């Protein structure tokens, strides 16, 4: 069994950092306020009162959104960051099947980059990494089958093979494989990306797998043991990766992240509110990808991966054991491994700058090697 990413974690990290800064500012104002009050002229006070009245409505609207509709605030957050980073949202169709994706840039002399997110996440989980990637790269982040804006159908094949076929349809629709592209996937997305590279070698010029699922370990870690117990007891409503309360959401965040932080109840509630309408689908998907058909698809196909491959893994991953990196390195001929200290399963969220740098450096080394071969 395996698992995936913390959805919305970049929002949480940003919030916690801002809270720390606000705390320092609050101490400063608390110390200085008596002096300010004694010196402030009544007219100046009145001016601030009038200005405060002018700002009251938007401030109240923000506070109301935070307290009453935190899920709306989360959606606004992603809209804002997509806009800031220049990521445009588009749709493309294969027959009657809709794919939703975001992109930046246009295909050029450098390989395009296709990014596949993890279980129960969406294309926007990559924004924290996109922020640190060069703007001259052509980036494409797609919603995986059944997620966010991509079609969700009860007839869809949600197995790893089924998802690989859907991603290939997406690639064909965009003509992304007109020239081999660089493929990146994390967790479940890493599982799909690895199998894709094995099935469609001519599409891919290089591969980055970030703590991918789909490997068979000799011993199960504590988390996998717990999942097996839940599966044996048919208690699928208790899967830790599918929270339905703020408390369960907090537990999932602690499981997937090495960083420990306290998230406000309103944010936790907002994250749960966003997920609850989709939880039945997540349960169906989860059971499909841990089934006998899909469970070890990457393991069964890793020796078929022939392109230069990069493995990135957090050393403190509690979900998928870091020893998986060594397994892949032994089976893939042209493979380099990057292990990150003080990092859990959510590598993309915990270490976005480092992840982006590793990817850019890897692409540069692969590109230089291929150029040297052409000269020879």
Model-found features: residue ranges?
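Conserved alpha/beta-hydrolase catalytic His-Asp/Glu region
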Residues: 70-72, 218-225, 239-306
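Alpha/beta-hydrolase fold catalytic core
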Residues: 15-16, 23, 28-113, 135-137, ...
């Amino acid at each position: 069994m395996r698992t995936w990413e913390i959805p919305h974690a970049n929002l949480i990290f940003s919030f916690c950092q801002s809270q720390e800064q606000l705390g320092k500012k609050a101490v400063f104002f608390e110390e200085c306020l008596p002096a300010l009050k004694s010196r402030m002229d009544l007219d100046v006070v009145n001016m601030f009162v009038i200005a405060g009245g002018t700002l009251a409505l938007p401030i109240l609207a923000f506070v109301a959104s935070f307290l009453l509709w935190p899920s709306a605030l989360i959606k606004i957050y992603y809209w804002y960051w997509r806009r800031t980073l220049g990521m445009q949202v588009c749709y493309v169709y294969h027959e009657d099947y809709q794919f939703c994706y975001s992109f930046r840039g246009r295909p050029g002399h450098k390989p395009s980059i296709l990014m596949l997110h993890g279980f129960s996440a969406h294309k926007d989980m990559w924004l924290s990494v996109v922020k640190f990637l060069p703007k001259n790269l052509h980036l494409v982040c797609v919603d995986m089958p059944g997620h966010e804006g991509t079609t969700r159908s009860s007839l869809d094949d949600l197995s790893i093979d089924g998802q690989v076929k859907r991603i290939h349809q997406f690639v064909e629709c965009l003509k992304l494989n007109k020239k081999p592209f660089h493929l990146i996937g994390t967790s479940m997305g890493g599982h799909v990306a690895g199998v894709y590279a094995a099935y469609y070698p001519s599409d891919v010029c290089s591969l980055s797998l970030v703590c991918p699922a789909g490997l068979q370990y000799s011993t199960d870690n504590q988390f996998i043991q717990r999942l097996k117990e839940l599966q044996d007891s048919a208690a699928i409503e208790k899967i830790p990766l599918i929270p339905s309360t703020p408390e369960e959401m907090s537990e999932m965040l602690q499981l997937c992240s090495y960083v420990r932080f306290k998230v406000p109840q309103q944010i936790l509630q907002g994250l749960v509110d966003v997920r609850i309408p989709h939880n039945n689908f997540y349960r169906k998907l989860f059971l499909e990808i841990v089934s006998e058909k899909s469970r070890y698809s990457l393991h069964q196909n890793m020796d078929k991966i022939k392109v230069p491959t990069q493995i990135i893994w957090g050393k403190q991953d509690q979900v998928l054991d870091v020893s998986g990196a060594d397994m892949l390195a032994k089976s893939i001929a042209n493979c380099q491994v990057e292990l990150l200290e003080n990092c859990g399963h959510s590598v993309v969220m915990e270490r976005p700058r480092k992840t982006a740098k590793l990817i850019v450096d890897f692409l540069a080394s692969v590109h230089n090697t291929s150029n040297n071969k052409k000269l020879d």
